[in-house]
Amino acid sequence: MKTTAAMLWEKLRDGSVEQRAIEFAKTTLPYLMVDPMSGSRGVVEHDFQSAGALLVNNLAAKLARSLFPTGIPFFRSELTDAIRREADSRDTDITEVTAALARVDRKATQRLFQNASLAVLTQVIKLLIVTGNALLYRDSDAATVVAWSLRSYAVRRDATGRWMDIVLKQRYKSKDLDEEYKQDLMRAGRNLSGSGSVDLYTHVQRKKGTAMEYAELYHEIDGVRVGKEGRWPIHLCPYIVPTWNLAPGEHYGRGHVEDYIGDFAKLSLLSEKLGLYELESLEVLNLVDEAKGAVVDDYQDAEMGDYVPGGAEAVRAYERGDYNKMAAIQQSLQAVVVRLNQAFMYGANQRDAERVTAEEVRITAEEAENTLGGTYSLLAENLQSPLAYVCLSEVDDALLQGLITKQHKPAIETGLPALSRSAAVQSMLNASQVIAGLAPIAQLDPRISLPKMMDTIWAAFSVDTSQFYKSADELQAEAEQQRQQAAQAQAAQETLLEGASDMTNALAGV
């Protein structure tokens, strides 16, 4: 029996993973896991606290600004050996090639940010933080990005964590289907009801080719393949399945919220109980002492100014609740919130602006790497890099062949690479300060070689000086130029002296 996409969907789904994701979303952003198959506005069950939503929104916004900063390309096309050889064969200046690559990078980045795609990427980051999983699709024709939660897709991975199968399930009204899909269904003998709904399955499978791996796609409705099929090199596949943290051997990732679910559970439970206790404490009961002549019915039915039996102390108000107990609970909640604030980078170290500086991006990247560990590095590999390849393929068809063979490769510029560049510059500054302090020693002791001392200091600070030192040919050319300048200066001096001598002789003859 042939395995259909619907059968594969049921096989690859993991109900326990989906249920855990729903619980994690409930304590933070419940709408992330709303069932898209409901066909209407889904019912969202909210928690008794909103701190989780605040923390996730804050962390997602920071990561989005750091990973995809507006106005700054998040990747840079590498000047590979293949590109250098091509430039040499065409006798093209390498600086012109570098400038052209930079223009391509900017154009690709600008295209990514069209049609509110940054908002969708922020949504993807929220899904990763809360559930650990997300599926996004880059539509190159429309220049848009679409994202789905675990409710809409299933995935299978191999032992190394590479995805092998992706099955996306979407529900459409029959009347909203593409005409091409309708024609394919009619040819297969399937009748569509105008008011009914159908499930559209999209299956993306990783396959091995003779030269490289590729992704193959087809659509299916009711066991019938519909529409056009697709095929891309695996690194140019527009379907991307990033994870927040993927354990070896697992098909689905784990989110940041799961690491702190204990604190979120305590925050939720105490917030609920404290809220109910505070409401109860607002109620006031009147205690009536009938031994002192007071009658409950008399006080219950009395109007203002009525005369009733009793004494001044026969009735007293009683308020429920204990202030000290509520203060202790609030203090415990505050301790939980402080821990979560630190874990979710809740602080005001970056301006809330449309454009941020490169230094602010670097600071956020450093804080994220220190707080989130290797997860931040993982996002560059399974989210940024695939998007960079796809966006570059949209800019210029001439780049496509180079992208397919990976002769044209994008290098991620934000995140950890920004930290590495900053660390390299800081090492150079530190080494320069040490050299400036030790340089006078070479003047005091003629036995000391200043270049050798500088080489030792550069090496101690792990500074690669090969990219700064002049080549032997450059040094020889400069020496030759200096000799020519010296010869010209000598000739000019001799000419000046001869002219002065002639003038002196002429004056003496007068």
UniProtKB/Swiss-Prot annotation:
Which branch of life, at top level? Viruses
Arranged from A to Z, the UniProt key words for this protein are: Capsid protein, Viral capsid assembly, Viral genome ejection through host cell envelope, Viral genome packaging, Viral penetration into host cytoplasm, Viral release from host cell, Viral short tail ejection system, Virion, Virus entry into host cell
Which GO annotations describe the biological process of this protein?
A: symbiont genome ejection through host cell envelope, short tail mechanism
Q: State a GO cellular component annotated for this protein.
A: viral capsid
Transmembrane region positions? none
Q: Which residues form a coiled coil?
A: none
Q: Where is the signal peptide?
A: none
InterPro entries named among the record's database cross-references: Connector_podovirus
Q: Where in the cell is it found?
A: Virion
Spell out the subunit comment: Homododecamer.
**Annotated family:** Belongs to the podoviridae head-to-tail connector protein family.
Role noted for this protein: Forms the portal vertex of the capsid. This portal plays critical roles in head assembly, genome packaging, neck/tail attachment, and genome ejection. The portal protein multimerizes as a single ring-shaped homododecamer arranged around a central channel.
Under what name is this protein listed? Answer: Portal protein
Q: Which organism is it from?
A: Pseudomonas phage phiKMV
The opening ranks of the lineage are: Viruses, Duplodnaviria, Heunggongvirae, Uroviricota, Caudoviricetes
Which gene does this sequence derive from? gp30
